[in-house]
Each structure stands twice: as C-alpha cells, then as structure tokens.
Amino acid sequence: MNVVCKFDPWNDPLCTCPKKYSLNPYTGCQHHCLYCYITSYIPRGFECRPKKDLFKRVKADLRKLDKPFPISLSNSSDPYPPMERELGLTRKCLKLIAEAGFPVQIITKSDLVTRDLDLLKEMRCVVSFTITTLNPKLSSKLEPNAPPPERRLRAVRKVSEEGIPVTVRLDPIFPCLNEEEIEKIVEEAAKAGALHITASTFKPRPDSWQRMVLAFPDFCKKTKDLYFKVGERHKSGRYLPASLRRELLLRVSKACEEVGLTFSSCREGMQELNTAPTCDGTHLLRSP
C-alpha cells in the first residue's frame, strides 16, 4: 500500500483543495484533539505509531509520482507528534522529498517544526499552523496533548522570519465556545507573520460529538439542535445551518481584510467568500 497518496481519495465535492499528495509518517495522533475526525476511520486513532518500512515505501512512492504536485504532511495525523523529537521520521521524510524535488506543505499544531527550518528554508514549502484558541485553559481541554497556543504563535513568527510562507488554520470554529476569539486570533496571526487564514466550522461525527459531550456539556446543550435539527448532514458529519456558517466565516473574512491577510474556507461550500487562489495556502509556494 502506498504511503504517499492522492489527497482526498473520496473525491468529496466540498473539497476545493488543488491537486496534491498526502503523506502521514505516523498512524494516529498523540495530540488527542477532542474534535478530531481521524478516529472515525483510523482504529485507535489517538495511539500514535510509526508506519512500518516507512522510508523504503516513501522512496518507492516518490519514484512513481510523475506530477510535481505538493506533498502534504499531514492530513490524518500531525507530522510532529511528541515522539517525533526522538524518532525523526518526519525529518527523514523531508530529506527524501527534497531529494526528489517535490514542494511540501506542513500542517501542524507543534512548534517542533522549527527544528527542521534548516531543511524547510531550502525547499519550496508552506507551513500551516492550526490555532483554534488563544486561551491556554480552553486549549488544554480541547487539545490536551498539543503544544499551547502561545508556543504555536512563537513558531509562526520564527518560521516566517526565515522567509517561509506561513498560514494559520482557524479550524474548527465552535459557536458559543471559541467564536468570540475569531478577530483576536486573526490579529495575532498577522502580527506573528502569517499571510493567509483558512477557516472551518466544527463538523461533528458521532465519536467526536460524544467526546465533546463529556468535556463540554454546556456547549453541546446549546448547539445540539443547531447541528442535529436545523443543521445539515454531509456523509457522516453534521453541519451548522448554512446561514450561521456564513455569518461566522464572514467574520473571519472581514478580520482578515482588516489586517491584510487572504482568506479561504475549508469544506464549507462557500468558495465565493474566498479571497485567495487556493483554499489551503499552497498558492504561497515559491516558484521553482
């Protein structure tokens, strides 16, 4: 089985990402974010383990790819879980990708990415940091094993100062939980050097909703009807009503406009709100 795969193999009509590949050096994720979707399709999704024969498989896959699309690390895990500090699987994969001449997109919640700046600044690269809140108490409950938001913001600044384009994913937005932080997150991201914001609303699946019920019962009581009575269903996920999603995303878009950042939404079906050529920030990759 390939480890460097086509992104979005299900061809979801709501996915507007440009063509790219996806590589997950690890199966599962240690960050244990309550809202995470991977537990709906990865057994033991919060148990992080290295892929077997990873480097051999990456080398073989890279030789077979004939289109120089970006390689995204990672979409079903974080490429910088705590164990990466010792194992260095992502770092080795980056070396292999660089040797093969592919551009790369990093998607992470970890400041450990700054360890690899020596490699990344020599590659065609864009780094995307997910920041859902600036409140360390909320973050520690919502994303218990991820680095706190202040460390992520420092990493945004550090990566940006090396001349590497940085985007921030405000993802997910929760009504009644983190929505009051929208404007401040965008402002702080801009101050730290981010160039683009990708935003998305919380789209619970059965397992992630149950985790939220246990950790944030008041939030779930307030929003249950929004998701399950007047909201929409898309495959196994629940969506807020389109009018509320548009309202939240317009706030992000307006905040971006005020500080000079581009904006896009993710899997919302509202591409008309986007102000960037791509939804994922890969338009920021340097020309070869």
Task: For the regions a language model picked out, list residue spans one by one.
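Hydrophobic faces of well-ordered beta-strands that scaffold small-molecule active sites
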Residues: 71, 104-106, 127-129, 166-170, ...
